[in-house]
Amino acid sequence: MDTKVDNAGKCPVVHTHTAHGGRSNRDWWPNQLNLRILHQNSSLSNPLGTAFNYAEEFKKLDLEALKKDLFALMTDSQEWWPADFGHYGPLFIRMAWHSAGTYRTGDGRGGAGAGQQRFAPLNSWPDNVNLDKARRLLWPIKQKYGNQISWADLLVLTGNVALESMGFKTFGFAGGRADVWEPAEDVYWGSEDTWLGDKRYSGDRDLEKPLSAVQMGLIYVNPEGPNGNPDPLAAARDIRETFARMAMNDEETVALIAGGHTFGKTHGAGDAAHVGADPEAGDIEEQGFGWKSSYGTGKGGDTISSGLEVIWTTTPTKWSNNFFENLFGFEWELTKSPAGAHQWTPKNGAGAGIVPDAHDPSKRHAPSMLTTDLSLRFDPAYEKISRRFFENPDQFADAFARAWFKLTHRDMGPRVLYLGPEVPSEELIWQDPIPAVDHLLIDAKDIADLKEKILASGLPISQLVSTAWASAATFRGSDKRGGANGARIRLAPQKDWEVNQPTQLATVLATLEGIQKAFNDAQLSGKKVSLADLIVLAGSAAVEKAAKNAGHDIEVPFAPGRTDATQEQTDVESFAVLEPIADGFRNYQKGEYTISPEELLIDKAQLLTLTAPELTVLVGGLRVLNANTGQSQHGVFTKRPETLTNDFFVNLLDMGTAWKVSPDSKYVFEGRDRDTNEIKWTGTRIDLVFGSNSQLRALAEVYGQGDTQEKFVRDFVAAWTKVMNADRFDLA
């Protein structure tokens, strides 16, 4: 391309539609609701097209051949990025760990499930320095196997193969992680505007929810200790908090740290000032490589990544118990790496020469440890576990295998989504197991008869709708947890959540259980209806009745096949994180938070995988169905509740109503008649945002039009069915 420049002071492109752009709306109005998170990963950004089915493509994969190629790669050291100790295994373990380790239980976001390590910000986080090289080493293999293996699956599988190639027996591997093609905009990584900032803490080192890392740009903890303070006990507190937020208990935490640090080394050959820009900030000729170093050769023995220069074991490319042997076998003193980072070395020169150099066979070293490694010895609870693993290597190996599998598969959802020949047969409690269907399913006539019995039970439409919603709306598209399947709404902890109105819920469930028992007892063919199915069917029957009340005959799609989980299959502590702190669809908020109710609504909608139109029609419909928590009348803008009309939108958009903040609460508003000043309605910020936000108002206007009442009902039913079936992966 010729690039003749006549006037260097002028840009030859008209600044109307440029890739860089000028100030965005969010630059001008930083508090504007971000509805873009509801429309991520559309077909417009997917080069594979809407017909592509990754699960079907993965089934064609020759996994054995792929693993053979990965095994060969482990020791095929490249001059442009030489392998430490002649083996890429430790680098690939770090890559897989850091892909999966962003997962947090609070909202289920992060994790390895979509291959987000390829994109900003993760590809340029300080904790991911030089993992760009690991992914580039994999490119020839990804190129060879194409769409039969996603990047997301390949990153995790490569970590598994790395472990196996160094003599470790893994617990298993499941494929099924489909790639996305753009960075995730829905994940809140923190409010800091500098790398390694930690404004996320308040009070007595209280970490902001839902974050699970101690500083911006780290996967979990600072290996030097809190803010670089080399205190193993203080570090242990951080470790326990952050690993718990990644769904790990103390035993799993010790196993993961010790197991991961059995292999490889950290890199701090020189001053970090030698390291250049991260991949996103790099020059175009770097082609996505980052952190170019001017220290020596910038690679091999001159590599600078974390700034720490630590080799833990005498056999860094072989599984062993040597991490614990060294941890307990030496007394440790504080020292500094060549880059000036705090780390630990054996006292009095002990251990000198027992550890190999990563690149020079003529050099030997003493073992070394991170502050966070010493936490496993000096924290009393961690020490007890570490000592047991030290004395029982088989227990350590089993614990690490299981914890590694959990780390790399936690965000995949239920076992039905696991693909491939290496899926372990053992059912694990953290997978939220649900019994398989072991009976004949109800048919169309049964469904009609059950609907009739439900509607004749005396339960009001509002309670049937709110119960079905409460059961299904726990679903999170982030980690595919929650949902109506399993009927866990009848079990602890969900049955006792405030948002679910426990007293009312118990009444509804008792009535539905009576209908279920009568139906099942009457069957001679082994046919049954589960309570999970009946709860959803009851809500759908109520929606149909409400539509009929409005003059619309419509059938809500229903697919039986849900089963009922037991309390023994339900980890109460694990499910506690699914409790909504807010559910704008039910006009519920548990407390006062730093972010607004309307932002919490958008977040909830995104977790439910809803679009902005689906969000809008659901809120409008649920309000007129009187489904608010506690039957609050805020936002019930209708004189005919339990009738599926577009009254919410008609009355919200009525210019005869003026809104003012209630004297009783800054979150509640009074809608007064402009002429008489009489109160017509009350509403929350959730309700009023559909008239205030320009995008949501545009959608509300569609549903408030006189010619869209039938469309409103159809769209509500479609969105309702989507939520009811959100966890029905068997229907996909």
UniProtKB/Swiss-Prot annotation:
Catalytic activity: H2O2 + AH2 = A + 2 H2O; 2 H2O2 = O2 + 2 H2O
Gene3D superfamilies assigned to the protein according to its UniProt record, in alphabetical order: 1.10.520.10, Peroxidase, domain 2 (1.10.420.10)
Entry keyword Metal-binding: yes
Ranges that cross the membrane: none
Enzyme Commission (EC) number: 1.11.1.21
Gene Ontology terms: cellular component: cytosol
Molecular functions per Gene Ontology: catalase activity; heme binding; metal ion binding
Function: Bifunctional enzyme with both catalase and broad-spectrum peroxidase activity.
Family: Belongs to the peroxidase family. Peroxidase/catalase subfamily.
Protein name stated in the entry: Catalase-peroxidase
Organism: Rhizobium rhizogenes (strain K84 / ATCC BAA-868) (Agrobacterium radiobacter)
Gene for this chain: katG
